[in-house]
Amino acid sequence: MIQPQSYLNVADNSGARKLMCIRVLGSSNRKYAHIGDMVIAVVKETVPNMPLKKSEIVRAVIVRTRKGLKRDNGMVLRFDDNAAVVINQEGNPRGTRVFGPVARELRDLNFTKIVSLAPEVL
């Protein structure tokens, strides 16, 4: 469960290392984001000499959460960290690589480019 003020690791090579969620996109009173939800975030930590700079406002999609994701078959999927991939306005990732596993539910939510770049889909 990601809410405003939550810190996220960045799971791509866009240049950001840490993001802080400032808004969960969806309805006006939405409190939490789960895997596959879009958030607006601010870049808190960056890699030197990359296009994304500190304090830049970006859109991101959540790809991993520590809170369990319950599937229809009863399996609960939990990850070790909260992570997101920085995306542009069209929903395509701004980086060219995705690090770490991502959930299969992203494919159903039309984030196929992120799923194809990921090394492991759970």
Curated annotation (Swiss-Prot):
InterPro entries registered for this protein in UniProt: Ribosomal_uL14, Ribosomal_uL14_bac-type, Ribosomal_uL14_CS, Ribosomal_uL14_sf
Entry-linked Gene3D superfamilies: Ribosomal protein L14
Pfam families, alphabetized: Ribosomal_L14
Database matches in SMART domains: Ribosomal_L14
Single Gene Ontology BP annotation: translation
Localization, UniProt: Plastid, Chloroplast
GO CC term (a single one): cytosolic large ribosomal subunit
NCBIfam families found in the cross-reference section: rplN_bact
Similarity section: Belongs to the universal ribosomal protein uL14 family.
HAMAP family: Ribosomal_uL14
Subunit structure: Part of the 50S ribosomal subunit.
Protein name from the UniProt record: Large ribosomal subunit protein uL14c
